[in-house]
């Protein structure tokens, strides 16, 4: 059985010192805002945006530690979705979306329901490094589930998490689709993007599932 490790995502090679990230919004009335997605937002943002960039945040590791009773599970059988765990050696890949003008309030209103009300996530500022220009970091808003929210499930062996994922379905689809689409995204990012926790759960699912699972729609890198 694979043991949980605090740092399981491999960051890219060290970069030369980068300038401080510049905030993308001011005084609660932003004209432009970057939103960092590291779970279902990487393939299904469902809000209008002006730009998007693949990249990573440092100091966090992605974990399937948040319970989901709506999108990928139910009250009786909560699914498992990802959150960010503070980890000074961690690196989490995802997509940052830029919203501007009227898109800002529309996106935040939508995400408040999707991520906060239905998902149990809080907001947090993170420093995002675009894959193509890592020396030009951006300040972004991320949705993070903490142990204080009632849906938080916390750590479990990868085999247990895989069993839960295989058994759960919610209004947005099967929990397995969520896992495999996230794994597809990581493969498209290239060999420098690694997430051992995610890979271990995919492997555990493969050992439990006798047949292959195909996503309904192919995933294209944004």
UniProtKB/Swiss-Prot annotation:
One of its GO terms (molecular function) is glutathione specific gamma-glutamylcyclotransferase activity. Its EC number is 4.3.2.7. GO terms for biological process: glutathione catabolic process; intrinsic apoptotic signaling pathway in response to endoplasmic reticulum stress; negative regulation of Notch signaling pathway; negative regulation of protein processing; neurogenesis; Notch signaling pathway; response to unfolded protein. It catalyses: glutathione = L-cysteinylglycine + 5-oxo-L-proline. Keywords: Apoptosis, Cytoplasm, Golgi apparatus, Lyase, Neurogenesis, Notch signaling pathway, Unfolded protein response. One of its GO terms (cellular component) is cytoplasm. Gene3D superfamilies: Gamma-glutamyl cyclotransferase-like. It is found in: Cytoplasm, Cytosol; Golgi apparatus, trans-Golgi network. The active site is at 115 (proton acceptor). SUPFAM superfamilies: Gamma-glutamyl cyclotransferase-like. Residues 1-25 are annotated as: Disordered. InterPro entries: ChaC, GGCT-like, GGCT-like_sf. Substrate binds at residues 35-40. Interacts with NOTCH1 (via extracellular region). Catalyzes the cleavage of glutathione into 5-oxo-L-proline and a Cys-Gly dipeptide. Acts specifically on glutathione, but not on other gamma-glutamyl peptides. Glutathione depletion is an important factor for apoptosis initiation and execution. Acts as a pro-apoptotic component of the unfolded protein response pathway by mediating the pro-apoptotic effects of the ATF4-ATF3-DDIT3/CHOP cascade. This is Glutathione-specific gamma-glutamylcyclotransferase 1. It comes from Rattus norvegicus.
